[in-house]
């Protein structure tokens, strides 16, 4: 199942660059994640928090099978 990073980011009218800045990752990383690339657990946490979500909301962003 595909992650929901792009959908959540766009719903918040946030650019890839802004999400990357807030998460402390590169825009290339955000692009890769939005296209389904795997990443470290620490990167997932950064993305979730940068989207303004709680870590308990992780399944809204990343499907359970990715944890």
Q: What is each model feature region?
A:
Residues 41-59:
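DNA major-groove recognition helix of helix-turn-helix/homeodomain DNA-binding modules
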Residues 10, 21, 49:
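Alpha-helical residues within the helix-turn-helix
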Residues 24-39:
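Recognition helix of helix-turn-helix/homeodomain-like DNA-binding domains
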Residues 5, 19-20, 30-33:
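Conserved hydrophobic/aromatic packing and binding residues within compact polymer-binding modules
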Residues 1-11:
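A short, Lys/Arg-rich alpha-helix, primarily the initiator
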